[in-house]
Amino acid sequence: MSEYNFTKIEKKWQDYWDKHKTYKVNEDPNIPKEKRIYILDMFPYPSANGLHVGHPEGYTATDILTRYKLLNGFNVLHPIGFDSFGLPAENYAIQTGEHPKKITEKNIKKFKEQIKALGFAYDWDREIRTHDENYYKWTQWIFLKLYKKGLAYTKEMPVWYCPDLGTVLSNEEVIQTPDGPRSERGFHKVKRKPLRQWILKITEYAERLIKDLEEIDWPESVKEMQKNWIGKSTGAEIEFSVKASKEKIKVFTTRPDTIFGVTYLVLAPEHSIVDKITKDEFKPMIVEYRERETLKSDLERTSLEKDKTGVFTGAYAINPITGEEIPIWIGSYILGTYGTGAVMSVPAHDARDFEFAKKYNLPIKQVVSQTGNNEILTQPFTENGISINTPEEFNNLKTDEIKERVIKWLTENKKGQKKVNYKLRDWIFSRQRYWGEPIPIILDDDLNEIPLEEDELPLRLPEIENYKPSGTGESPLSRIQDWVNIKRNGKTYKRETNTMPQWAGSCWYYIRYLDPNNDNEFASKEKINYWMPVDLYIGGAEHSVLHLLYARFWHKVLYDLGYVNTKEPFKKLINQGMITSFAYQDENGILIPNDEVEKKDNKFFSKKNNKELKQIVAKMSKSLKNIINPDDIIKEYGADSMRIYEMFMGPLTDSKPWNTQGLIGIFRFLNKIWTIKNKELTKESASKEIISELHKTIKKVTEDIENLNFNTAISSLMIFINELLKHDKNYLEIFKPLTIILSPFAPHLGEELWEYMGETPSIFKSAKWPEYDPNLIIDNTREIVLQINGKIKDKIILNKGTNEEALKSIALKNHKIMQNIQNKQIIKIITVKDKLINIVTR
């Protein structure tokens, strides 16, 4: 009797798949559209840490569906690649002195080994790497399309700069501390510095990015996050004149009806008009305030928890309807990059304005009330209501009506207009870094931009030894004079030295998978028409906004230019839940690393002080030493065990904690299948009952895979395997279809069993998914309700016709029943055949 040697089996079939290119995909024109499917994983960033057990969860889900579709005769595109440009590799390179390209390619090698060890059905001939010049040539090509369409421009923008590190930092690399912002690396002081940046006009697509969400099958939570990020609001843009000046200040408001209650204006400290209108005696305070407040991040400036601060400019604005003079302040809670960078403040009807007015003793004028009467305000009234304390033509009106009247008056008097505003800001696209796509633009002496010609692409990233920060805030590329300075038609030009962000390569990678070796175009129209859109996209919810929004934006631009055939790139989106791990917390709530914890009598204690710890569920992290390495799991239990366990832990979209005991249970399950394989394989007919159970299992597994309910599909397989173990023989008519429906979950074992039965490998090429016969499904079970004194305590499944004595015995041994009848006297037990049992107690 042979043992289940998973190591040997898994290596054998992985080698076979590689050698025979089992999963290579072609665009067969004879396969109809309804029999083609594009299943996509969010491709990984190849970090130095390699995969942990959380990464393969989504990959396993798509792999099961891919194999299921192959067995159902589909042409399946299921590719993989690497998002290999970006900041982490560059930072790691700076720390270690190893070139980012070398680091990246070493990491990719490790990732590929780990991914292949899990037996995923990827077409490796379609592998892409965003740092490969044959890939980023087309990223640059798309950038030029954006530029020529007027969607890419340059502007000076404030960025974080660290003088000690000599580099620009991203928001994620800056920590806010009580002593001001600091660099995460080295904990140095940082400041804001204006730098010329490339920006993409994503705002031009704001409305379509909201509207077209209706056309795609995405989680409502993700749609809401995108809508909130875009932040559409309808209101009015109103123009306030500055007293004794030609300057005008535009504000946007969703409540134009409250214009009669405006008692001050607030400008962003960086607003361009501030220097022009500030009175001389107030300038020192303005300068000091600006220097202090602009050090803060946008998040900190706008936080509802933070105290609102401001400084008076000495200037006044004129209310366009009432003619009242109102003071103009600056306040850091207003951002220059949002809306007009100015707000009209109505403290009686806005919480933030109310707080500011109270702090600085500014007037509070009520112009809306619930009843239409003046009320004593202890807090702002922010709801709709009835207008009060307004000019007669606007008084005593409901909010919606006065809004329309105010907008009509402003429009007729050329003081404002109806406006739709978006919270979404244009995308700052450039980075002052080395490890990214060079931007294909050259500049003349006056900084006029000249795009490269398409035949000049790719503009290659030069391989340099010194990729460390320049010290000036410019990209390290700025130091390479023979690369930066170029001659053209007798004139000298400079190359753009900023690079693209990591998001650039991931904006369109799903298209390059269609035609990864095409040197003449980013993908042929024929292949785009053959596969697009992506039918199923699986990835983490952390990408709900940025990656998914940016990819949708680029796709819409490509659609407008006629390069793609769909308005949306991803038809259906699923976010897999996070796989967490156990962590340990002391009495003060401090998390203790796992290697400092010991277990005694099912309790957990600190090795340092022997104090008891609380076991909690937490995200896997290096600091907590609770990361599970898939290499270790595969070595001890096999890839098939790990795949099935990750799917069995719970619903795909739920977060769930890793528990190795559960994995051991799955390993035993696969060994049970091997035990059945070791029984005598017979062509004899199986009993009607076991055939019925097989068809029930086929039905359940089929429906569950279609609905991505992998955990319940596995559960039904387990139930059926336990039933088969009761039989002395291994029936071919049962084992063959069982092997097919098992194979998407455990492909290595599936291949081995398929070959064992004398079939031609690969199972995913030669087998056909079995169909269940409804006529053969005999339901011999019944749900029995367990009651105590007429109240339901539990429900159990028993065979149809279970006799009364057996039913009583089973009920009295039921855990929930036993809990509820302790110390009670049983008066009688009432049974209704195949329906219920009621235990009467007192």
From Swiss-Prot:
Annotated positions binding ATP? K622
Keyword Transferase on entry: no
**GO BP terms in the entry:** leucyl-tRNA aminoacylation
Full protein name: Leucine--tRNA ligase
The species this protein was found in? Borrelia hermsii (strain HS1 / DAH)
Reaction catalysis annotation: tRNA(Leu) + L-leucine + ATP = L-leucyl-tRNA(Leu) + AMP + diphosphate
User: Any keyword Glycosyltransferase?
Assistant: no
Q: Show the disulfide pairing.
A: none
* Top enzyme class: ligase
EC number assigned by the record: 6.1.1.4
One Gene Ontology term of the molecular function aspect: aminoacyl-tRNA deacylase activity
Similarity comment: Belongs to the class-I aminoacyl-tRNA synthetase family.
Its keywords, alphabetically, are:
Aminoacyl-tRNA synthetase, ATP-binding, Cytoplasm, Ligase, Nucleotide-binding, Protein biosynthesis
Q: Which GO terms describe its cellular component?
A: cytosol
- One matching Pfam family is tRNA-synt_1_2
The source's superkingdom equals Bacteria
Show the HAMAP family listed in the entry: Leu_tRNA_synth_B
Compartments annotated for it: namely: Cytoplasm
The UniProt entry annotates the motif 'KMSKS' region at 619-623
Motif 'HIGH' region: where in chain: 44-55
